[in-house]
Amino acid sequence: MSQLAHNLTLSIFEPLRTTGTIVCTIGPSTQSVEALKGLIKSGMSVARMNFSHGSHEYHQTTINNVRQAAAELGVNIAIALDTKGPEIRTG
């Protein structure tokens, strides 16, 4: 589809369709369900968590909140896990 053909199909009355990926790193200030819903409404499609910081419980709460926010808005959100540096991981 040409750029002109694409532009002709756009409508101000339809929700914005993103063609890119917006990755947001989730931290303490964006961990709540309401904050996550705001990020999703703003275009977030991937929630990134930095495993270098935080406990297992903190990360589980974040995952649960991302899933709940996505379910309430009826969208799919990917979860990216950024693990610690160049270590050898087993199991």
Swiss-Prot record:
Q: What pathway is this protein a component of?
A: Carbohydrate degradation; glycolysis; pyruvate from D-glyceraldehyde 3-phosphate: step 5/5
Going by the UniProt record, its keywords in alphabetical order are: ATP-binding, Glycolysis, Kinase, Magnesium, Metal-binding, Nucleotide-binding, Potassium, Pyruvate, Transferase
Superkingdom is Eukaryota
**Positions with a binding annotation for ATP:** 50-53, 89
Q: What reaction does this enzyme carry out catalytically? A: pyruvate + ATP = phosphoenolpyruvate + ADP + H(+)
Kindly list the residue ranges recorded as spanning the membrane.
none
Sites where the protein binds K(+): 50, 52, 82-83
Q: What is its EC number?
A: 2.7.1.40
Q: Where does substrate bind?
A: 48
InterPro entries in the record: Pyr_Knase, Pyrv/PenolPyrv_kinase-like_dom, Pyrv_kinase-like_dom_sf, Pyrv_Knase_brl
A Gene Ontology molecular-function term? kinase activity
Q: Which cofactor does it need?
A: Mg(2+); K(+)
Q: What protein family does this chain belong to?
A: Belongs to the pyruvate kinase family.
Q: Tell me the subunit arrangement.
A: Homotetramer.
For this entry, the protein name equals: Pyruvate kinase
Q: What species is this protein from?
A: Leishmania braziliensis
